[in-house]
Amino acid sequence: MPSFADLTTENGLVELNKFVSDKTYIVGFVPSSADVQAFNLVKTAPCATKYPHAARWFNTIASYSAAEQGQFEKVTETVTIAAPAAPKADDDVDLFGSDDEDDEEYERQLEERRKKAMEHKKPKETVIAKSSILLDVKPWDDETDMVELEKCVRSIEMDGLVWGASKLVAVGYGIKKLVINLVVEDLKVSTDELEEKIKDFEDYVQSVDVAAFNKI
């Protein structure tokens, strides 16, 4: 189950931002009760500059009304808030400290200044625009080998393309479609080109549709 520090604190938002960096929702491929729980724990929209992934996720959930959120898929996974570290006992506090501790603190501060000075000298890193995409890949019929179909899809390699989780979803009459998540670098991967590559496996694939698309 997802676990974070207090989501009203900077530590909690840092953890949430990292957690949803490659996800659209907290659990699975559709909004669920876990998203509502986390949304209520965050309370206010995260800063889009400091926490872009958390802000994108928060705004997605905020776009649904309370009534709509109540209709989200109910999941067994729940969001937990990790207990903060216990404060140091009073009788363990050294009110006067020691020379060794003073020296260590001085060295630590000196090292921090060195690191900050080096960071200013480093060229700024270019932000790489990425997108999280959910594809629906439909077979011709119920006799299509879905294991081979998925192998074919995952065999596609493109610079800037990373395949993620997948599952088979029933669509009726014994037919199942492949729902697969992927992350692409926008400047390197064309979704149209990717769809055409998947459709080239014409013995298995009838159609490819984008079910969800989110900038990350």
From Swiss-Prot:
Main localization category: cytoplasm
Gene Ontology CC: cell cortex; cytoplasm; cytosol; eukaryotic translation elongation factor 1 complex; phagocytic vesicle
Cross-referenced SMART domains: EF1_GNE
Keywords: Cytoplasm, Elongation factor, Protein biosynthesis
Gene3D superfamilies reported in the protein's UniProt record: 1.20.1050.130, 3.30.70.60
Subcellular location field: Cytoplasm
Keyword Methyltransferase: no
Biological process terms in GO annotation: actin filament polymerization; response to bacterium; translational elongation
Subunit-structure text: EF-1 is composed of 4 subunits: alpha, beta, delta, and gamma. Interacts with actin.
Function summary: EF-1-beta and EF-1-delta stimulate the exchange of GDP bound to EF-1-alpha to GTP.
Protein family (similarity comment): Belongs to the EF-1-beta/EF-1-delta family.
Protein name: Elongation factor 1-beta
Natural source organism: Dictyostelium discoideum (Social amoeba)
Gene for this chain: efa1B
